[in-house]
Amino acid sequence: MITAANLLRIIFPFYDPEVLRWSGEARLMRTLFFAWMAMGVVVLFSASYAESLDTSGTGLSIILKQIAYLWLGLNIFNFLVRLPLQVCLKLVPWFLIVVLLLIFLTKSGLGVEVNGARRWISLGPILIQPSEFMKPCLVLQAANLFGNWHRFPWRSRLIWLGIFALTLGSILLQPNLSTTALCGMGLWLIALASGLPWIYLISTALLGITTAVTSISIRDYQRARVTSFLDPFADPRGDGYQLVQSLYAIASGGVLGRGFGMSQQKLFYLPIQTTDFIFAVFAEEFGLVGCITFLAFLGLFTTMGLRVAMRCRHRVKRLIGLGVVIFLVGQSLLNIGVASGALPTTGLPLPFFSYGGSSCLSSLVLAGLLVRVARESNEAEVIPLGTKTAPAV
């Protein structure tokens, strides 16, 4: 039955009076996520205004779409923070298989090619990127597998390791090396945190590095990204153009920045300024002070997220919390590294900043999982299901 309070929470998903009964850490994590989203909306509004005005005649088209995605994502977030993690762990194998099938469909007639890669499926006017939804699925299933490693028979272990490998391979073939690398590193770090034997970790790390090097060596565009990253000014109007314009934007920001809305590079000089290179617009408008402030925010988020995870007495829940922090913070640092020229150009968005429905929804699912971990770290808030829980550590 939908009560007036529930209806109000659906319409205004940031409104939730039940939050007052949560633990302090759960409330703090929710506040940090909302602050991150608020910063992202402000920056995206500025970065997208000129493009929206040029393509639709109004400067609000992109930001209004993003707000719609946030509204949907926040309702999913509110649902997940009330859903016991044991239920999530029971359902995630089915979700993972469905998302994997959707990734396969990107190579079929339903797949949409953008910039030489088939990573999207068209649903009328909406494009979805299945690989984004794989991230929370991998966090949950990896935490369950590696957290209960000794409970799984070898046959089950090999089946799930094979599914993980198939998932990474299917994303790589889109081609999408950056998301493959992020998911691979996320799985590896969750396995490391679970205490798996070093022989497994070292062998999989070597296999991953070999796969990445092979992919770069056989794909011309990936090799061009690496060479342009090493010296973007060698071809400033060709392969190095994106990075050169991004560096110009960051340098133009100086110490205090040009001011909100005053970026010059977003005026059709910097490509994909609303997605992969949105941090460059942020740096140009808010300067070194703004960049340091945002990095400090990421540091605070990482500290609190790790504290929430480490307080959990259940191994699987602890690994879920660690996995969420790894994916959100790791992706953020990779995006910033690309925009600042510290890493080769990739296609990873900046969570809660970059425009895109799939990325927005995926990030909010991860956020909901971490807040739920924070709620369940207080044993009084755990909802009993009458099922066997993960082993305590």
Swiss-Prot record:
Q: Which domain of life is it from?
A: Bacteria
Q: Which residues lie on this side of the membrane: Extracellular?
A: 52-60, 106-119, 179-181, 263-285, 340-350
Q: What GO terms are given for molecular function?
A: lipid-linked peptidoglycan transporter activity; peptidoglycan glycosyltransferase activity
Reaction(s) catalysed by this chain's protein: [GlcNAc-(1->4)-Mur2Ac(oyl-L-Ala-gamma-D-Glu-L-Lys-D-Ala-D-Ala)](n)-di-trans,octa-cis-undecaprenyl diphosphate + beta-D-GlcNAc-(1->4)-Mur2Ac(oyl-L-Ala-gamma-D-Glu-L-Lys-D-Ala-D-Ala)-di-trans,octa-cis-undecaprenyl diphosphate = [GlcNAc-(1->4)-Mur2Ac(oyl-L-Ala-gamma-D-Glu-L-Lys-D-Ala-D-Ala)](n+1)-di-trans,octa-cis-undecaprenyl diphosphate + di-trans,octa-cis-undecaprenyl diphosphate + H(+)
Where does it sit, as one GO cellular component term?
Answer: plasma membrane
Topology of this chain in the membrane: Multi-pass membrane protein
Top-tier EC class:
transferase
Database matches in Pfam families: FTSW_RODA_SPOVE (PF01098)
- Under Enzyme Commission nomenclature, its number is 2.4.99.28
* Residues on Cytoplasmic side: 1-30, 82-84, 141-157, 203-242, 307-318, 372-393
Q: Name one GO biological process term.
A: regulation of cell shape
Kindly list the places in or outside the cell where this protein is found, as annotated in its UniProt entry: Cell inner membrane
Q: Which InterPro entries match?
A: Cell_cycle_FtsW-rel_CS, FtsW/RodA
Chain ranges passing through the membrane: 31-51, 61-81, 85-105, 120-140, 158-178, 182-202, 243-262, 286-306, 319-339, 351-371
Q: In which pathway does it act?
A: Cell wall biogenesis; peptidoglycan biosynthesis
Q: What is its main location?
A: membrane
Sorted alphabetically, which keywords does the UniProt record give?
Answer: Cell cycle, Cell division, Cell inner membrane, Cell membrane, Cell shape, Cell wall biogenesis/degradation, Glycosyltransferase, Membrane, Peptidoglycan synthesis, Transferase, Transmembrane, Transmembrane helix
The record describes the protein's role as: Peptidoglycan polymerase that is essential for cell division.
Q: Which family does it belong to?
A: Belongs to the SEDS family. FtsW subfamily.
Q: Know the name of this protein? A: Probable peptidoglycan glycosyltransferase FtsW
Species lineage = Bacteria, Bacillati, Cyanobacteriota, Cyanophyceae, Synechococcales
